[in-house]
């Protein structure tokens, strides 16, 4: 029996069903690489970021995620080289899909029990996404933003449902906008942490705080 089409598993039904000691014999997810390109680039090198954002609540199989990653990665390498971007898959396929195999040959009713005991066995894995979930992100320099948009548009075609490609106002993969990042960097309140940053908070004696100066 061949693999069932992914449209059979597109709608999320029931509770999440992850791999566990009660759920064994699960095949590995097809996607194994979640970061591509120049992964070790510092946060300063790629200030612009483009996302694929989901517009539906659905399940996306690991095969679709891997196909999208390959399409985006190949397009970016072709046009801007492998050292000019950092591509990241933002969702993980934890949910296990099941199949209750049915025979379709003559005399199948003698060989199987039909819908009796129809819980099914593990078939593959899928990621559960909501409206507004970010599926893929790529950070680049300003001249390469148009190539990032084109690459993620090609990757978007590998998914079911509706998605959109958006250019974020954030600095790279951080939670800060580019204006906030520049201001905090000038104030020397940022500590680089790989592709992200840590913000140094206000610490010290209470006399420094504006609130206690007014009392």
Swiss-Prot record:
GO molecular function, one term: structural constituent of ribosome
Domain of life of the source: Eukaryota
Keyword Cell division attached: no
Any single biological process term in GO: translation
Cross-referenced Pfam families: Ribosomal_L16
Protein name: Large ribosomal subunit protein uL16
InterPro entries according to UniProt: Ribosomal_uL16, Ribosomal_uL16_CS_euk_arc, Ribosomal_uL16_dom, Ribosomal_uL16_euk_arch, Ribosomal_uL16_sf
Protein family according to the UniProt entry: Belongs to the universal ribosomal protein uL16 family.
CDD domains documented for this protein: Ribosomal_L16_L10e
Name of encoding gene: RPL10
Signal peptide: none
PROSITE patterns: RIBOSOMAL_L10E (PS01257)
Keywords: Ribonucleoprotein, Ribosomal protein
Region (Disordered): 1-22
Species of origin: Tetrahymena thermophila (strain SB210)
One Gene Ontology term, aspect cellular component: ribonucleoprotein complex
